[in-house]
Design a protein with these regions (language model features):
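Bacterial N-terminal signal peptides that target proteins for export
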Residues: 1-11
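N-terminal signal peptide c-region/cleavage motif recognized by signal peptidases
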Residues: 17-20
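Inter-heme linker and motif-flanking segments adjacent to c-type heme-binding CXXCH motifs
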Residues: 45-46, 75, 100-113, 128, ...
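Gly/Gly-Pro-rich "capping" loops immediately C-terminal to redox-active cysteine motifs
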Residues: 44-76, 80-86, 119, 123, ...
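Sequence/structural segment immediately N-terminal to covalent heme-attachment motifs in c-type
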Residues: 23-45, 106, 110-133, 148
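C-type cytochrome heme c attachment motif
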Residues: 32-41, 60, 64-67, 92-96, ...
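C-terminal capping alpha-helices of c-type cytochrome domains
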Residues: 84-106, 150, 176-194
Length: 194
């Protein structure tokens, strides 16, 4: 009888405690997200290389990019008008929402030879010093693993040409050392990481 009571107590504690260990539900999409999904896809998983995947991106990176678009430190003919008049709270809500979404694989199949060259270039230029191992990103440094290939190429070329300079000089410095082939190699490598 004593064993049964002990078992019953432990079982009831586990049942009562289980909601405390349950995962919190994903945050509801803020109203402004309805506009974002037209380009960035459902839950921030872009299905075209023209637009970056926002799902799983770092909160701080998303928030700072929205601020930079609004302050004209970064420019894009489609994105810049979207942030005009956006409030700080709306930016925070969007960054919070998209950072908590799960990124999905793009289906990109890297060219093995280019990806191998890209890995060597990424190692030589110390990409993981900022983007971390697995290119997961941190704080204001973006997650680039599994990002859209075309988008990676476009951004590396923009950093190289210094048409995108909202990076504090880090990426413009690194990209300036890359040839166009190097950029394609690195993009093959990074876009293929899942």
């Amino acid at each position: 009888m004593h064993r049964f009571r002990c078992f019953a107590r432990v079982a009831s504690l586990l049942v009562l405690a289980s909601p405390a260990f349950a995962q919190a539900p994903a945050p509801a999409a803020p109203p402004k997200a309805a506009t974002c999904v037209a380009c960035h896809g459902p839950d921030g998983n872009s299905t075209t290389g023209a637009y970056p995947i926002l799902a799983g991106q770092t909160f701080r990176y998303i928030y700072l990019q929205l601020q930079d678009f609004q302050a004209k430190r970064r420019s894009d003919p489609l994105m810049s008008p979207q942030v005009e008049g956006m409030t700080k709270d709306e930016m925070i809500a969007l960054a919070e929402y998209f950072s908590k979404q799960k990124p999905t694989q793009t289906g990109f199949k890297p060219d093995p030879a280019r990806a191998a060259k890209g890995e060597k270039i990424a190692t030589a230029t110390l990409c993981t010093m900022c983007h971390l191992g697995g290119f997961a990103g941190q704080n204001e440094i973006p997650r680039v693993a599994g990002q859209q290939y075309d988008y990676i190429v476009k951004q590396l070329k923009a950093f190289k040409a210094k048409t995108r300079t909202n990076d504090g000089g880090s990426m413009t410095s690194v990209a300036s050392t890359m040839s166009d082939d190097d950029i394609l190699d690195v993009a093959n490598y990074v876009a293929g990481i899942y």
